[in-house]
Amino acid sequence: GNCKCDDEGPNVRTAPLTGYVDLGYCNEGWEKCASYYSPIAECCRKKK
């Protein structure tokens, strides 16, 4: 699914971004969001 990381949680590398939910590791109860446009831009956000 899609995700946004401008206001939903602490950014890991680059923010803001819009992307897709990745299966990468974040803390329990959080999910990783990876940017559509940059392979290194990602963040963790609280699961909805």
UniProtKB/Swiss-Prot annotation:
Main localization category: secreted
Further remarks about this protein from its record: The C-terminal lysine was not positively identified.
Name of the featured protein: Delta-stichotoxin-Hmg4b
Record-linked Gene3D superfamilies: Anthopleurin-A (2.20.20.10)
Pfam families in UniProt: Toxin_4 (PF00706)
Cysteine pairs bridged by disulfides in the record: 3-43, 5-33, 26-44
The keyword tRNA processing is annotated on this UniProt entry: no
Compartments where located: Secreted; Nematocyst
Listed GO MF terms: sodium channel regulator activity; toxin activity
Record's function text: Binds specifically to voltage-gated sodium channels (Nav), thereby delaying their inactivation during signal transduction. Its toxicity is greater than that of RpII (AC P01534).
A cellular component annotation (GO) from this entry: extracellular region
GO process terms (BP): regulation of signal transduction
